[in-house]
């Protein structure tokens, strides 16, 4: 059912059990939304509709589903774009770069139109949309200057993909996904001025165990294939329990990496303590820390004893072999030893994003050197034309 009531000063509160309650300006509850209900929210306030810490123009449709609550912003394409441009690109960048972003984002949005509940996602899964908070004078000007203009290839809207930075060369679409699009071909990028072009991320053995539990973390990692620009296509990982192969995209998602233009290195840090934990009685830990290479009889290696003081002897060579249940007279089924490796995975990477289509940092550089929005777009999307939108482009 669709709720058809009018309220003023309305506040919506969403509970963890997906229950939605409405409160008036005096904070008095006036209505509960039930499962399968729909609710339309609109306002005459020029500041928009608040959702958490963000404001949105237009209207909001709220849907109560079996497993989720969907909040959909109903807004015209041009108004939507003035927020998208500021969400996707710093508004202090050159106007020609902002205009290129506006045309690419308009094309991308119209290409996605037609989802059963909403047309386009508001995150970087599609393109980022932060509502009125990212709308500025410059973004509105960029959208007005390019009003209705879209990118077409053979009189059809292109899939106008874009990304932050490719680190020198953009990627062919077929080398990242299966589909080949002639206009999404590898071209030179001009993104060397990106201050975050190079990056590095480290993963401890404990983190790797959590990321790859089925194979027991990472003992070895081998890159099986790369693209012409050096992006990882496939890797093989050997863990304590077995091995598995992953695509570069899978690894990027699983490890939350900025891109697939990466290299891996497993290092043994001699200065990093090995850790052995013994869990006793309801997962309460007794933890030992020993520096790799040290003689256990010469150091104090007992820390964080949570239940009992534990006395060990110089004859003990390896804390993982301490017969803790005998010393503390605790049943063996309540004692568990867990050892961790001292290997750390270092991921060194370049660029940010999938690397296909327009590079935003490349667009900025070209704009600072005098390129127009059209020149920027035709560099990154090969063989396209820029035309006012027509229905038959869909």
Where are these regions (language model features)?
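Sec-exported extracytoplasmic/periplasmic mature domains
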Residues: 86, 90, 106-114, 213, ...
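Exported/periplasmic cell-wall-interacting domains
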Residues: 96-97, 102, 110-115, 139-147, ...
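Extended substrate/cofactor- or partner-recognition/assembly subdomains adjacent to catalytic sites
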Residues: 93-280
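Intrinsically disordered, low-complexity Ser/Thr-rich linker and spacer segments
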Residues: 270-287, 329-344
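Acidic/histidine-rich, surface-exposed loop or edge segments in extracytoplasmic proteins
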Residues: 76-92, 189-193
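Primarily a LysM-type cell-wall glycan-binding module
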Residues: 278-308, 326, 350
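A contiguous strand-loop segment
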Residues: 5-76
């Amino acid at each position: 059912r669709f709720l058809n009531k009018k309220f003023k000063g309305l506040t919506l509160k969403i509970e963890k059990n997906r229950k939605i309650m409405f409160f008036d300006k005096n904070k008095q509850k006036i209505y509960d939304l039930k499962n399968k209900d729909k609710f339309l929210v609109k306002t005459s306030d020029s500041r928009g509709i608040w959702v958490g810490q963000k404001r949105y123009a237009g209207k909001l449709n709220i849907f109560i589903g079996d497993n989720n609550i969907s909040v959909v912003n109903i807004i015209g394409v041009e108004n939507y774009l003035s927020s998208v441009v500021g969400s996707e690109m710093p508004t202090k960048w050159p106007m020609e770069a902002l205009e290129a972003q506006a045309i690419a984002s308009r094309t991308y949005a119209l290409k996605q139109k037609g989802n059963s509940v909403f047309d386009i996602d508001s995150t970087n899964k599609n393109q980022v949309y932060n509502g009125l908070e990212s709308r500025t004078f410059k973004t509105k000007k960029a959208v007005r200057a390019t009003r209705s203009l879209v990118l077409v290839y053979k009189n059809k809207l292109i899939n106008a993909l874009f990304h932050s930075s490719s680190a020198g060369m953009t990627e062919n679409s077929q080398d990242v996904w299966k589909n080949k699009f002639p206009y999404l071909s590898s071209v030179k990028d001009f993104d060397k001025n990106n201050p975050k072009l190079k990056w590095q991320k480290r993963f401890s053995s404990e983190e790797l165990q959590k990321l790859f539990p089925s194979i027991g973390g990472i003992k070895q990692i081998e890159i099986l294939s790369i693209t012409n620009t050096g992006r990882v296509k496939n890797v093989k990982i050997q863990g304590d329990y077995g091995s598995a192969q992953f695509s570069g995209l899978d690894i990027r998602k699983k490890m939350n990496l900025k891109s697939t233009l990466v290299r891996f290195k497993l290092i043994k840090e001699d200065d990093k303590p090995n850790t052995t934990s013994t869990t006793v009685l309801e997962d309460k830990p007794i933890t030992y820390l020993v520096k790799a290479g040290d003689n256990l009889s010469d150091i104090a290696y007992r820390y964080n004893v949570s239940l009992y003081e534990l006395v060990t002897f110089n004859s003990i060579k390896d804390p993982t072999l301490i017969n803790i249940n005998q010393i503390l007279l605790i049943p063996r089924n309540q004692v568990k030893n867990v050892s961790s490796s001292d290997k750390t995975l270092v991921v060194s990477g370049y660029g940010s994003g999938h690397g296909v289509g327009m590079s935003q940092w490349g667009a900025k550089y070209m704009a600072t050197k005098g390129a127009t929005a059209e020149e920027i777009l035709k560099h990154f999307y090969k063989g396209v034309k820029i035309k006012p939108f027509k229905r038959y482009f869909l």
